[in-house]
């Protein structure tokens, strides 16, 4: 379980997060939704210790993350940022192997290769694993980075807009894969996502942010409501039920 208690963050005097508290339950997919600038990515980065908080506390499995050893934390928590830049020429397989660094320190074992090959298989990258990243489409590159996170084999996986650059087919495949990681392997996944319909269909719990505050949280059946979404997005979004899934018709 991850507990965020009264976390605040400012940049240059501008409040990005204000007295934010939320609990992430284990073994579930939790989605952060909200308009641009709401604080979603900042909250995720603070939870993963990529950004320092100004105040507040964050606990992972009962331990304050500031007190966690970095090497041990990397075995428990992995994160994929919104923008990923690597300045050396790597193949997909090379990149995915980086996910094992917390365990191998660069000296890969047979067990490491099991995780690497499993991640490549999950992401359907075996046939192109020897291609260089600069030879890939945006979607293929995104899938390679997600495979690296999977290879890290952590209890907690934090993903900042992982559907960027993906077409509909691969977006659905990614979300189904994340669901499998939760249901089959017991992973806990937190995802920043813009499409409320992906959040509705695949999340166990949704947290909505606006202007640096959590304005609403709950299961999809409570969150994907016209009145709730209007408070979050300042627009009226009709809701339809299709195959027992609540879908927001926001493009009409």
Swiss-Prot record:
Protein function: Part of the ABC transporter complex YclNOPQ involved in uptake of ferric-petrobactin. Petrobactin is a photoreactive 3,4-catecholate siderophore produced by many members of the B.cereus group, including B.anthracis. Probably responsible for energy coupling to the transport system.
Keyword set includes Phosphoprotein: no
Classification via SMART domains: AAA
Localization, UniProt: Cell membrane
PANTHER family assigned: IRON(3+)-HYDROXAMATE IMPORT ATP-BINDING PROTEIN FHUC (PTHR42771), PETROBACTIN IMPORT ATP-BINDING PROTEIN YCLP (PTHR42771:SF3)
InterPro entries: AAA+_ATPase, ABC_transporter-like_ATP-bd, ABC_transporter-like_CS, P-loop_NTPase, Siderophore_ABC-ATPase
Membrane topology: Peripheral membrane protein
CDD domains, per database record: ABC_Iron-Siderophores_B12_Hemin
Reaction equation(s) it catalyzes: a Fe(III)-siderophore(out) + ATP + H2O = a Fe(III)-siderophore(in) + ADP + phosphate + H(+)
A Pfam family: ABC_tran
Source organism (scientific name): Bacillus subtilis (strain 168)
The keyword Membrane is assigned to this record: yes
Annotated positions binding ATP: 34-41
GO cellular component assignments: plasma membrane
Residue ranges of every copy of the ABC transporter domain listed in the record: 2-236
Effects seen without this gene: Disruption mutants are unable to use petrobactin for iron delivery and growth.
EC number: 7.2.2.-
Keywords: ATP-binding, Cell membrane, Ion transport, Iron, Iron transport, Membrane, Nucleotide-binding, Translocase, Transport
UniProt name for this protein: Petrobactin import ATP-binding protein YclP
């Amino acid at each position: 379980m991850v507990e965020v208690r009264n976390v605040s963050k400012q940049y240059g005097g501008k409040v990005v997060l204000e007295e934010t508290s939320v609990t992430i339950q284990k073994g579930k997919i939790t989605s952060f939704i909200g308009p641009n600038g709401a604080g979603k990515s900042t909250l995720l980065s603070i939870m993963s210790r990529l950004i320092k908080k100004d105040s507040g506390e964050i606990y992972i499995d009962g331990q304050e993350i500031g007190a966690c050893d970095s090497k041990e934390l990397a075995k428990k928590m992995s994160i994929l940022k919104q923008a990923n830049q690597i300045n050396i020429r790597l193949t997909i397989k090379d990149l995915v192997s980086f996910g094992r660094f917390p365990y191998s320190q660069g000296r890969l074992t047979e067990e490491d290769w099991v995780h690497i090959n499993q991640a490549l298989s999950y992401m359907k990258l075996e046939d192109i694993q020897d291609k260089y990243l600069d030879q890939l489409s945006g979607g293929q590159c995104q899938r390679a980075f997600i495979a690296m996170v999977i290879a890290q084999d952590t209890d907690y996986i934090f993903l900042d807009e992982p559907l960027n650059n993906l077409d509909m087919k691969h977006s659905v495949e990614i979300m189904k894969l994340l669901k499998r990681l939760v249901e089959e392997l017991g992973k806990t996944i937190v995802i920043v996502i813009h499409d409320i319909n992906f959040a509705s269909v695949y999340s166990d719990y949704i947290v909505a942010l606006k202007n640096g505050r959590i304005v609403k949280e709950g299961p999809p059946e409570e969150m994907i409501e016209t009145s709730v979404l209007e408070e979050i997005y300042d627009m009226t979004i009709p809701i339809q039920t299709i195959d027992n899934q609540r879908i927001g018709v926001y493009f009409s």
